[in-house]
Amino acid sequence: MSARPQADFDGKAFAARLSTAPGVYRMYAADDSLLYVGKAGALRKRVGSYFNGTPKNARLTSMLSQVARMDVTVTRSEAEALLLENQLIKSLSPRYNVSLRDDKSYPYVLLTREDWPRIALHRGPRAVNGRYFGPYAGVTAVRETLNLMHKLFKLRSCEDSVFRNRSRPCLQYQIGRCSAPCVDLVAAQDYQEAVRRATMFLEGKSDQLGEEIMHSMQQASEALEFERAARLRDLLSSLRSMQNRQYVDGRAADLDVLACATQSSQACVLLLSFRDGRNLGTRSFFPKTNGEDSAEEILAAFVSQYYAEHAPPREILLDRAIPDAELIEAALSAAAEHKVALKWNVRGERAGYLLLASRNAQLTLVTELTSQSAQHARSEALREMLGLAEQVKRVECFDISHTMGEATVASCVVFDASGPVRGQYRRFNISGITPGDDYAAMRQAIERRFRRAVEENGVLPDVLLIDGGAGQLAQAQAALADLGIENVLLVGVAKGEERRAGHEALILADGRELRPGAASPALQFIQQVRDEAHRFAITGHRGRRQKARMTSKLEDIPGIGPRRRASLLKHFGGLVGLKAAGEAEIARVEGVNAALAARIYANLHGLALPDAAGESSP
């Protein structure tokens, strides 16, 4: 997720649009130089803390005064955010992070390079000759890995000074966690083989290692070496019970992960990159589209164009299949002079990467659509299209939602030049109309909203959008006329051909019809507002419908009146809790005896109802 450069960056507004998920945030100056990278357990809270109140010190004041934009990357956990933060700091060297982080904060697994290698936890500078695996999110993760290494491969952990002076095996040998190379109880060749296998495991090559051990086990069985075969069998069993990899290794293969999100005729392609096994974070791209391109087509074009200028890794994960995949794959392979594989049907860790990229693409696109600079541009385009003399400061949109006339709800959403003003959204439960009469529902909602504005001298919108055609627009016109409101510009948003986005017709109160086209920033703004009104109406309708259906289930039971119904729902926290209860538990509710409890249970579970004679309905 990102915010584009602005003259005066509004950190509070940016933070308010973030999710509460864990992740990493990055602050950039106006010249696009990276100022700071940090991690957060809850992005909205952490980022917002920078812009609430006075900065705590001069360094923070200086840094925040230079912020022109921010990016965030959502992660699956705070531990993953910590790893990504460390990797970004190392690879990008942000100006204000230099004195805040060093390797002492992050533990590694060290496998030394010597005649009898040892495996151990390591912090600090990499002064010891060996392979370093990590960084890990914490000491606990390293210790779990070391415990596994000792159990599976029986590698030593003692310091060299201890190793050189032992005359008999230590306790680690006695409990089966070391092969005692210190007193020559294991051949050098066998120990080096154990080191090789441990390295394969730490590199994430568990599948290859498992196949190798399986082959060795079969060979041992054929040679009637049953004891060795049993040891290999146990090793294979333990290996398969572990996760394939628990860290990011410095020598893992390069990988790019691409996800595409589309909304309101706009698209975002998010690139998540790994180089030398390190997560380098995300980059967001907003390709120009004609409003009719599918996400698959947009992603295919991006892959072709982006990797024409950037060296592709050997593996590129895509969140969907793309047209001409084989052709693109062949072209990239030829240009790169190495095999480039495009993949989308993946499992395990790679599926997690795709999910992460897809989630970030959606969040980034939503942020882009609601970012202040983009909203100002679209708002200005709307003003020009409608021929208004002044800036559009407030837009409202109404939509109706119901299921075959049931539980009709109208929504009213509010946007200003900076985006949605969610605190002023309103829903109206529609009643007293013929079920399914959208015209009457729209008129009732408009009357209720604007009558209150007239009575209380409330704020009126500059533009009022009505999701519907000429009929819905006429109802809104009549409602405003009855209330004496004349200075609100009405616009009906009629669905386009085959209900395709970008083909909407805008109907004005004087009968004129505008078709600005998918590429129009003004229409994109209208689409965004209309889609938000639609979402808000559907959410309200579903909640009202569910509540009505829950209540009606109890109303159908003889002996259940309003008082008992309220007691039951309050006691169990709703119908779901009531359905999960047994007859005895239901009978504990005040005013419910055993016979009534049996009837309630039977009704909720579709069983034959007991006789209801003799029950009243309080």
Curated annotation (Swiss-Prot):
GO terms for cellular component: cytoplasm; excinuclease repair complex. Residues 20-98 form the GIY-YIG domain. GO terms for molecular function: DNA binding; excinuclease ABC activity. It is found in: Cytoplasm. Residues 207-242 form the UVR domain. CDD domains: GIY-YIG_UvrC_Cho. Keywords: Cytoplasm, DNA damage, DNA excision, DNA repair, Excision nuclease, SOS response. Coiled coil: none annotated. The keyword Cytoplasm applies. InterPro entries: GIY-YIG_endonuc, GIY-YIG_endonuc_sf, GIY-YIG_UvrC_Cho, Hlx-hairpin-Hlx_DNA-bd_motif, RuvA_2-like, UVR_dom, UVR_dom_sf, UvrABC_protein_C. One of its GO terms (biological process) is SOS response. The keyword Oxidoreductase does not apply. Belongs to the UvrC family. Interacts with UvrB in an incision complex. This is UvrABC system protein C. The gene is uvrC.
